[in-house]
Amino acid sequence: MSHPALRQLRALSFFDDISTLDSSLLDWLMLEDSMTRRFEGFCERVTVDMLFEGFVGPEALEEEGEFLPDEPRYWLREILLCGDGVPWLVGRTLVPESTLCGPELALQQLGTTPLGRYLFTSSTLTRDFIQPGRSDELWGRRSLLRLSGKPLLLTELFLPASPLYGEEK
């Protein structure tokens, strides 16, 4: 967790009451479709810069563990999602090892493919919740998703250059 954006992501404070948030902000934070697809409307090319990818133990989960089953190993993927080479979002995906069977094994082979390009082509994708959060002046969210009923937790932090902030103002 050496990248500064990951430290900010881990510092997100999440909240359930969204009634005071601006509708244009909520349009981003509560988006149920692919964030990759949303970003593609604001640039020529969306790319992934890999920060970390590999198995970790439960000690790497901290409070995230309350949303995932207890297992000895989890697949962790930490990335920067960039629009035309500019980092717009830092993402952290935690996948219990038991989720990585059948078609979901492909989650380990995404490489620099955006997660959304895989997730939103699956007919078995469901979402339990989206929870908005904030770290200093930056907005983020976490989502518990399921593929064929098997969980994965995605946490995203919108970086200062993200189009979210251009629309928010």
From Swiss-Prot:
Identify the GO cellular component terms for this protein.
cytosol
Oligomeric state and interaction partners are given as: Monomer.
**Which protein is depicted?**
Chorismate pyruvate-lyase
Q: Name one Pfam family in it.
A: Chor_lyase
Q: Which organism is it from?
A: Cronobacter sakazakii (strain ATCC BAA-894)
Enumerate the residues binding substrate. 35, 77, 115, 156
Question: What's the superkingdom here?
Answer: Bacteria
The free-text function statement in the UniProt record for this protein reads: Removes the pyruvyl group from chorismate, with concomitant aromatization of the ring, to provide 4-hydroxybenzoate (4HB) for the ubiquinone pathway.
